[in-house]
Structures are given as structure tokens and as C-alpha cells.
Amino acid sequence: MVTLPPQETNRHNRHCPRMLGTAAIEVDATKVVVQATARLVPQPGEAYDLVEIETDRGTTACHYYEAEGARDGVVMVGGTGGGFDSPAGGLYPRLAQDLPHHRISALRVRYRHPTDLMESTVDAILGMRYLESQGVSAVGLVGHSLGGAVVIQAAANDPKVRAVVVISTQAAGTEPVARLPKGAAILMIHGDADTVTSPRSSEETYRRAREPRRLVIYEGAGHTLDEAAGSLFVEVKAWLLKHLPGTLV
């Protein structure tokens, strides 16, 4: 059971148990403090709130792109490179700026420990809880590389998840894909020229997943799928708009 209430301010928290393998990571009784946000405009046309979520495990930083009154939200996470990295030539900032026009809020999450699957999953769950505190009741998750396993683990923790997108996923940690919430739709994307994570990782994950599911393999595309950036954006956006219930198409 995941209990990460963002409204709480008590910092005396119990240690979170972890389970890896066929069961999803479980996070129990972690209380968090959400810092006041600051509006940032890093470049023309892009504006977001900087959100810092404090726990006894450290501070998780996020970029929040709000759609006023949205009931749907999307959390995006990267791979082991850390920071606010993005595949496909800036897929994440592009999506994050576009989704609010469809009444979907977006949150990009920076891992505290980008090589640690469990801690990265906690970060993703914290992101979902932050969106919940902003009125979001249905969630989509997008993850690249390690982030593919992260969003599968996070989705298996929360029945509010309606859409999952895994891009160039690793195999380790994807076992809970068979236990996603009922009706949660998962899209798996890989390049057949990926030399970092094998396309077989996505193919095996697809075989274990329940419907609705979709597998897309881009010919000649590598790990970051820069070669397919345009069509990847269209594919991911269409999946989110189709499976999040309150969106504007």
C-alpha cells in the first residue's frame, strides 16, 4: 500500500520497505513537505513551476506545467543520466508544453538517485501524489530507459494510473507489468538499433502485459530515438490523449 500524502508536514517518517522482482515496490507511510513553487521561464515559450518535494529521504525536484482545472496529469521520468533528461531531442519538454492545451497537467521529475530503481520509483510516486494534491484524479506515466521500469513499478502501486508509456526500457524491474491497474493501457516503444537496452526488453515486457497494450519498434533508431523524434512525439501524445479520460483532443 502506498501512502505518500503531499499535504503532510511531519518529517518524522518510518523507513520505506522495498520489494523488487515480480512484485512492485511498496512504499509505506512516507510523509512529505511540498515547498512553495517558483515560476520559471527558462526560454521563450516555456514556463513551469519549480516544485521541491521534501522527505526524510531527500528532496525530489520537479518541473510542473499546470493546466488549470485539469483532472488528468502526466508524470515523465528519464534514465540513469539523471537531471531533467529527455529522449528523442526534447520529447519531454515538448510534451509538457503541449499537454496543458488538452487539459492535462504535466510533471517532469528529477531523480534523487538516478541509478537506484527503488529510490527512482519513490520519486515517481511522489510526483503522482503531488499531481493528486493539485486535483488530478487520473494519471499517465512516461519513462525512458531505467524510467521504463520505474513507471511500471509506480503504476503497479496506484489504481489511478490510466496510461503508461515505456521508451527503450530496460528489462530489470519490469516484472510487475502483469499487475498494472485494470484497464491501464501500456505503450512500449523501442528502436531496433538500440545498443544500450535490447529491443527484446520491450518485446518481453509486451508479452507479459495485459490489454490494452501496443508495441512499436522504430527501424534504424537508437536508444534515445532521435532518429524518430517527430513520429515518437505523435505516437506518445496520441496514446495519452486516447487513454486519459478527461482530455481535450
Question: Where is each model-derived feature located?
Answer:
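Acidic catalytic loop of the alpha/beta-hydrolase fold
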Residues: 192-197, 224
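Short beta-strand/loop motif that positions the catalytic acidic residue
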Residues: 181-183, 187-190, 194
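Catalytic histidine-centered segment of alpha/beta-hydrolase-like enzymes
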Residues: 221-233
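Short, surface-exposed "cap/lid" segments of acyl-processing enzymes
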Residues: 57-59, 67-101
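Short alpha-helix in the alpha/beta-hydrolase fold that links the catalytic acid
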Residues: 198-207
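Gly/Ala-rich beta-loop-alpha elbow adjacent to hydrolase catalytic centers
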Residues: 143-151
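Alpha/beta-hydrolase active-site loop
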Residues: 115-134
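N-terminal cap/lid segment of alpha/beta-hydrolase-fold proteins
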Residues: 2-69
